[in-house]
């Protein structure tokens, strides 16, 4: 069935997330091994082997040049506008979707991309450069330095010879020196080793740097602080033991490169204090690849050591380009709209070249870290910064003897937090572990998005050589001997590095250790470090930009160490990257909210991880797929026992986490139900209490009415027959043998006597009430107050007071109380017509 045909019944569509990446990996491997390559490109007397289909698909220029060519081994010589330095990264981009950029080759790459009409690259990467690197709002460094650098971890005794070795340049060294534009904005120190050009050419190529005063250092560093609520607790926990390493904190801005002249005068260039932060841009976030400047990191101390832009030797013939010092000064005076990269280069052409003395190079290894100022707010960062012309005070050393150029202090845009939060959900598990290239310390690099789940990763054993103190520079930015100068200044700690919306690949060129990384995109090669050897910030020297549409989150990759090739095409002689799978560490974490706890942020023991596990599918499928689909996926791939064990462990932990979440939810539901029941019972209790009070009030009113009626009945008694009749209907009122009613000991009028009087009234008015035998058992109740009223009424009428005395024995002491039950019983049995009585009274 054709793909375009519409089936009669619904069809199941499987979309692979790694197919595109696998195709590119296979083509790149074929190109490096010269398999099925059908075209040879000659650029500046260098040969590049490639496939026509790939070139034609990426470039309109090659489409027009190669379509219709039937020759088997076609040789195409590119015009002089295309340089090897600019074409090399573009060719690698065509096969890997990753563009390696540095300040040395940005200009040539842009020129070559325009000439070759690689519009996809321009729309993605260069739009990013325009909005991020050259935005006058953010105050990022725009000056170029043609002095490229070597790898920072080569032996010092061999660095001098490698500086002069101009004939062994390969594309490996080319890619090693091509750091991405993030080095212009990242707050981490960026290492620049001695260039591979003669000293005289260095003096013309290097840009003179401003001399920064130390009196504004503290204020600038204080302005660089950002406080983000998400990492508040993490900051407090991680800044406890980092102050002793502050003497090695340096910046990742090339604007603070400075030369130490005899006059120490201010040179053209953007001072560190003038660097401002870029407000977040909310439009075209997906089309224009915007890079988050680690905006939600705690402070400047936590920024040192995240990413290092490691560079190797440049081309033998350096291109003498003008510095952008004038542009920097102009940018420092005004806040203009983002300028284009091409306009920047046109401006820089008019600037005079300034020589840099080869006898000395100022290092900033003793730059203190920014103090953790809790009082500063993000609004403080939007103020204008004064030029930073301080001297970092490191001893002068010869340029030949120095393998590293260090940079100024870190600065970060406070407004970028919103941008990071918007892109955070795209990559919740972008936690990166890269192998350590630094002999002194082996640390781990973590990149956390705005909703990244650090608690997952901290729940796992923390790798050895944890985060160094805030003061630790990147290895290249330290003017240390290779024997281990920094070892005494690196307290272990962990810290977050925000995930960026731009896929960035950090490629270490460090020789000794195997790289162990993990990616956040399921469309690229996946690898997951489970051992503790992974990663110091020192091991992340190179930044690669990937404009692959399937790469949504920041992707920090540490590819295999690339060795120089033997041919011109050997510049990309890498080990073929294998298809790897993303791993979500800490899947047994109790929560996916990504929130920090102080226990998590302080859990920094040095522990080892297991071996790296490479999977042919993204790790998300392990936890997301249903049971049947998961088993089918396992059967489709040939997996080793180690991989199976890892897969089942991840799935088991995921199930445990889900079960724990459900259990917590059930408990919360039970608690809520109990709370509802308690509220209902409380309301019912209040209702019953109010009803009881109402009943008491009604009962009191009824007793008052009964008392009045009993008094009237006693007042109406005229003869013994009436008393007998009253006694027959109301046995509680017995005649008393007392001589006078006054001899009866009156009791205070109470509810019980009122009830008794009421019974008398009922007995006279209603002839059906109570038989003598129906009286409740117990001693007869002799009313005191009521009988007193009755006898007193009779005495007033002239009745003989001895009438009652002959009726029975003397009144014995009686109980003066009647229970409420008796009252209710009598009330139920006796009925009265109260309305006439009320009218009568």
Curated annotation (Swiss-Prot):
What Gene3D superfamilies has UniProt attached to this entry? Potassium Channel Kv1.1, Chain A, Transcription factor, Skn-1-like, DNA-binding domain
Name used for this protein in its record: Transcription regulator protein BACH2
Q: Where is composition skewed (Polar residues) in this entry? A: 584-598
Domain named BTB is located at 37-103
Family, according to the entry, reads as follows: Belongs to the bZIP family. CNC subfamily.
Q: Where is this region: Leucine-zipper?
A: 671-678
Which residues lie in Basic and acidic residues bias regions?
214-224, 298-313
State the encoding gene. BACH2
Under Gene Ontology molecular function, one entry of this record is:
DNA-binding transcription repressor activity, RNA polymerase II-specific
Q: How is it modified after translation?
A: Phosphorylation at Ser-521 downstream of the PI-3K pathway promotes nuclear export. The reversible disulfide bond may provide a mechanism to regulate the activity in oxidative stress responses.
Task: Give residue numbers for the modification (Phosphoserine).
Answer: 315, 521
Q: Which UniProt keywords apply?
A: Activator, Cytoplasm, Disease variant, Disulfide bond, DNA-binding, Isopeptide bond, Nucleus, Phosphoprotein, Repressor, Transcription, Transcription regulation, Ubl conjugation
Associated pathology: Immunodeficiency 60 and autoimmunity: An autosomal dominant primary immunologic disorder characterized by intestinal inflammation, recurrent sino-pulmonary infections, impaired lymphocyte maturation, and variably decreased immunoglobulin production.
Q: Which PROSITE patterns match?
A: BTB (PS50097), BZIP (PS50217), BZIP_BASIC (PS00036)
Role summary:
Transcriptional regulator that acts as a repressor or activator. Binds to Maf recognition elements (MARE). Plays an important role in coordinating transcription activation and repression by MAFK. Induces apoptosis in response to oxidative stress through repression of the antiapoptotic factor HMOX1. Positively regulates the nuclear import of actin. Is a key regulator of adaptive immunity, crucial for the maintenance of regulatory T-cell function and B-cell maturation.
């Amino acid at each position: 069935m054709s793909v375009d045909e519409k089936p009669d019944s619904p069809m199941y569509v499987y979309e692979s997330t790694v197919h595109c990446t696998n195709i590119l990996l296979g083509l790149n491997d074929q190109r490096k091994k010269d398999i099925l390559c059908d075209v040879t490109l000659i650029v500046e007397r260098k040969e590049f082997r490639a496939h026509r289909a790939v070139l034609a698909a990426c470039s309109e220029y090659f489409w027009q040049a190669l379509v219709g060519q039937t020759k088997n081994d076609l040789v195409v010589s590119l015009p002089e506008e295309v340089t090897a330095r600019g074409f090399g990264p573009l060719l690698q981009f065509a096969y890997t979707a990753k563009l390696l950029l540095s300040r040395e080759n940005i200009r040539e790459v842009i020129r070559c991309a325009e000439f070759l009409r690689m519009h996809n690259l321009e729309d993605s990467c260069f739009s990013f450069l325009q909005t991020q690197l050259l935005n006058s709002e953010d105050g990022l460094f725009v000056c170029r330095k043609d002095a490229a650098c070597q790898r920072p971890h080569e032996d010092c005794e061999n660095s001098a010879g490698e500086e002069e070795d101009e004939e062994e340049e390969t594309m490996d060294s080319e890619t090693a020196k091509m750091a991405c534009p993030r080095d212009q904005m990242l707050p981490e120190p960026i290492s620049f080793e001695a260039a591979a050009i003669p000293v005289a050419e260095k003096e013309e190529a290097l840009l003179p740097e401003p001399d920064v005063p130390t009196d504004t250092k503290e204020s600038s560093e204080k302005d660089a602080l950002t406080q983000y609520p998400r990492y508040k607790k993490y900051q407090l926990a991680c800044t406890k033991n980092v102050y002793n390493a502050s003497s090695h904190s340096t910046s990742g801005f090339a604007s603070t490169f400075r030369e130490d002249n005899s006059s120490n005068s201010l040179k053209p260039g953007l001072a560190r204090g003038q660097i401002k932060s870029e407000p977040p841009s909310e439009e075209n976030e997906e089309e224009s690849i915007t890079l988050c400047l680690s905006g939600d990191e705690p402070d400047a101390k936590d920024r040192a050591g995240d990413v290092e832009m490691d560079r190797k030797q440049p081309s033998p013939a350096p291109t003498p380009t003008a510095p952008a010092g004038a542009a920097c000064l102009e940018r420092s005076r005004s806040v203009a709209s983002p300028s284009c990269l091409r306009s920047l280069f046109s401006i820089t052409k008019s600037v005079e070249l300034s020589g840099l003395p080869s006898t000395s190079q100022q290092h900033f290894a003793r730059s203190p870290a920014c103090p953790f100022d809790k009082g500063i707010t993000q609004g403080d960062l939007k103020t204008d910064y004064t030029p930073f012309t301080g001297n970092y005070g490191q001893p002068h050393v010869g340029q030949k003897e120095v393998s590293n150029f260090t940079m100024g202090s870190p600065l970060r845009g406070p407004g970028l937090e919103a941008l990071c939060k918007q892109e955070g959900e795209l990559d919740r598990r972008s936690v990166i572990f890269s192998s350590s290239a630094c002999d002194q310390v082996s640390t781990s690099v973590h990149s956390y998005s705005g909703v990244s789940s650090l608690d997952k990763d901290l729940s796992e054993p923390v790798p050895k050589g944890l985060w160094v103190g805030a003061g630790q520079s990147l290895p290249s930015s330290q003017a240390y001997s290779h024997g281990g100068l920094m070892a005494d200044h690196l307290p272990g700690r962990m810290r977050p590095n925000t995930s960026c919306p731009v896929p960035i690949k950090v490629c270490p060129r460090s020789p000794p250790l195997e790289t162990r990384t993990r990616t956040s995109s399921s469309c690229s090669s996946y690898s997951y470090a489970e051992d503790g050897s992974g990663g110091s910030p020192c091991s992340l020297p190179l930044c690669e930009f990937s404009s692959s549409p399937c790469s949504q989150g920041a992707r920090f990759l540490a590819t295999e160490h690339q060795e120089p090739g033997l041919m011109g095409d050997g510049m990309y002689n890498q080990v073929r990257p294998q298809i790897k799978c993303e791993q979500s560490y800490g899947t047994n974490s109790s929560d996916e909210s990504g929130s920090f706890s102080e226990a998590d942020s302080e859990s920094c023991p040095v522990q080892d991880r297991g071996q790296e596990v490479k999977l042919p599918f993204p790790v998300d499928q392990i936890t997301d797929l249903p049971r049947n689909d998961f088993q089918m996926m396992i059967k489709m791939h040939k997996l080793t026992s180690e991989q199976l064990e890892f897969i089942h462990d991840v799935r088991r932990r995921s199930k445990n986490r889900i079960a724990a979440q459900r259990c917590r939810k059930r408990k919360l539901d039970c608690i809520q139900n109990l709370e509802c029941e308690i509220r209902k019972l409380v309301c019912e209790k209040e209702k019953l209490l109010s009803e009881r009070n109402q009943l008491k009030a009604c009962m009191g009113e009824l007793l008052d009415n009964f008392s009045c009626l009993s008094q009237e009945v006693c007042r109406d008694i005229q003869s013994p027959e009436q008393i007998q009749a009253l006694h027959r209907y109301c046995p509680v009122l017995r005649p008393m043998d007392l001589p006078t009613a006054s001899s009866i000991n009156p009791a205070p009028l109470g509810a019980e006597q009122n009830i008794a009087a009421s019974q008398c009234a009922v007995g006279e008015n209603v002839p059906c009430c109570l038989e003598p035998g129906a009286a409740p058992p117990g001693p007869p109740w002799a009313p005191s107050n009521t009988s007193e009223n009755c006898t007193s009424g009779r005495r007033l009428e002239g009745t003989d007071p001895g009438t009652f005395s002959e009726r029975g024995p003397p009144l014995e002491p009686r109980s003066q109380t009647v229970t409420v039950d008796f009252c209710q019983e009598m009330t139920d049995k006796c009925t009265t017509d109260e309305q006439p009585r009320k009218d009568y009274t």
